[in-house]
């Protein structure tokens, strides 16, 4: 048995370099496209481009010309030129939606023949919230599997919350799977992290997740993810939650699972999830036993008949530690207002709206009761009957 193991290790490097024959190379790989809509989506695409991702084409879409010029992507599309003159949507989703609708023909050409499309956007603004559902709809009608990454606003961004929730509902209608990411969770886990740094961390998480999935589908890895399996899980995944964890400890298999389960990026009950896509990144010291242990412990509480697929990638940058990204699909908990930690904010807004409405109604009532000119009151003359007393 030892000799077999020795020979396997001896020829491992050779097998890595000659994994595909010329005949297999003739087959086309899945066409994967990542579209970043608005400022947040552009940031994700920019990071992916800086990672030199070769397994997916990146497209940046915006109504803001200056933001678009600062974004690195394979394709950059300025939409709504006639509406916004390249100055942005001003936080109005309806403008972002109209701009995307006017560019529908351009989007159809860009997304033609795509097999999988990731649509990334921050919810609550103008361009991302309005254009992302349109982009997802175009990709869906082109026959692609559409996976949305919806980044929800911080609690302090009060004006964006209701717009974000409305945008999320639209994304759910047109995407096969929507991975919902709550920015507030980062502040809960890292309370001293500045807001701009928190945005940066979330952008990095999304970019590395997409790169990991794309690379494992299209580039030879330790354990590849089959595109058909991804399609089976993501094709009807509904709402999904992303778990991320890292560990450097000696017992890193258990440590990374604990880190994942204690840092979900959406506060929902994922124990009844119907699908799980797990991607493991590790160094050459990552063993098959550790990988199997990670998968088993991470998916222990999900549905017994859940479709679980996993991939593993070996990278020298991960020597001594392991990173796990898991996407749980088919989440049954649909109470997003509760899960997104917006109850207090929305309740305050509701009470404020009630007070404003009450004040407005009071002003209207006072106006109705006021008089434009003084009223003269007249005392009506009354006829008084005086009894007649006969003179004696």
Curated annotation (Swiss-Prot):
GO terms for cellular component: cell division site; cytoplasm. CDD domains: FtsZ_type1. Keywords: Cell cycle, Cell division, Cytoplasm, GTP-binding, Nucleotide-binding, Septation. GO terms for molecular function: GTP binding; GTPase activity. It comes from the Archaea. Gene3D superfamilies: Tubulin/FtsZ, GTPase domain. GTP binds at residues 126-128, 157, 160, 203. It is found in: Cytoplasm. Its main location: cytoplasm. GO terms for biological process: FtsZ-dependent cytokinesis; protein polymerization. Essential cell division protein that forms a contractile ring structure (Z ring) at the future cell division site. The regulation of the ring assembly controls the timing and the location of cell division. One of the functions of the FtsZ ring is to recruit other cell division proteins to the septum to produce a new cell wall between the dividing cells. Binds GTP and shows GTPase activity. Homodimer. Polymerizes to form a dynamic ring structure in a strictly GTP-dependent manner. Interacts directly with several other division proteins. Belongs to the FtsZ family. This is Cell division protein FtsZ 2. It comes from Archaeoglobus fulgidus (strain ATCC 49558 / DSM 4304 / JCM 9628 / NBRC 100126 / VC-16).
């Amino acid at each position: 048995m030892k000799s077999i193991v020795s020979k396997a290790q001896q020829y491992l490097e050779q097998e890595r370099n000659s994994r595909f024959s010329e005949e297999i190379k003739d087959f086309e790989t899945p066409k994967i496209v990542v579209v970043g809509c608005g400022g947040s989506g552009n940031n994700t695409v920019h990071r992916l481009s800086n990672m030199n991702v070769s397994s997916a084409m990146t497209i940046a879409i915006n109504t803001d010309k200056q933001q678009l010029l600062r974004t690195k992507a394979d394709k950059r599309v300025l939409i709504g030129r006639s509406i916004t003159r390249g100055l942005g949507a001003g936080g109005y989703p309806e403008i972002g939606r109209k701009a995307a609708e006017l560019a529908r023909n351009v989007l159809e050409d860009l997304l033609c023949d795509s097999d999988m499309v990731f649509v990334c956007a921050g919810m609550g603004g103008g361009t991302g919230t309005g254009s992302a559902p349109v982009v997802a709809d175009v990709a869906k009608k082109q026959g692609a599997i559409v996976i949305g990454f919806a980044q929800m606003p911080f609690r302090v961004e009060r004006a964006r919350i209701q717009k974000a929730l409305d945008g999320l509902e639209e994304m759910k209608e047109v995407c096969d799977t929507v991975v919902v990411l709550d920015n507030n969770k980062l502040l809960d886990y890292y309370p001293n992290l500045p807001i701009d740094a928190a945005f940066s961390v979330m952008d990095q998480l999304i970019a590395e997740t997409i790169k990991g999935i794309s690379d494992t589908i299209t580039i030879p890895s330790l354990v590849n993810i089959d595109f058909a399996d991804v399609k089976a899980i993501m094709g009807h995944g509904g709402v999904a939650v992303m778990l991320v964890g890292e560990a450097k400890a000696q017992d890193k298999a258990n440590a990374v699972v604990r880190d994942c389960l204690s840092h979900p990026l959406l506060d929902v009950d994922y124990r009844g999830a119907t699908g799980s896509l797990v991607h493991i990144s590790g160094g050459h010291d990552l063993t098959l036993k550790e990988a199997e242990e990670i998968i088993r412990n991470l998916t222990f509480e999900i549905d017994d008949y859940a479709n679980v697929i996993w991939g593993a990638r070996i990278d020298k940058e991960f020597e001594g530690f392991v990173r796990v990204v898991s996407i749980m699909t088919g989440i049954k908990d649909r109470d997003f207002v509760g899960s997104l930690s917006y109850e207090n904010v929305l309740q305050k807004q509701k009470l404020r709206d009630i007070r404003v409405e009450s004040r407005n109604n009071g002003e209207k009532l006072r106006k109705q009761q006021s008089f434009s000119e003084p009223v003269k009151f007249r005392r009506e003359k009354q006829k008084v009957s005086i009894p007649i007393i006969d003179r004696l």
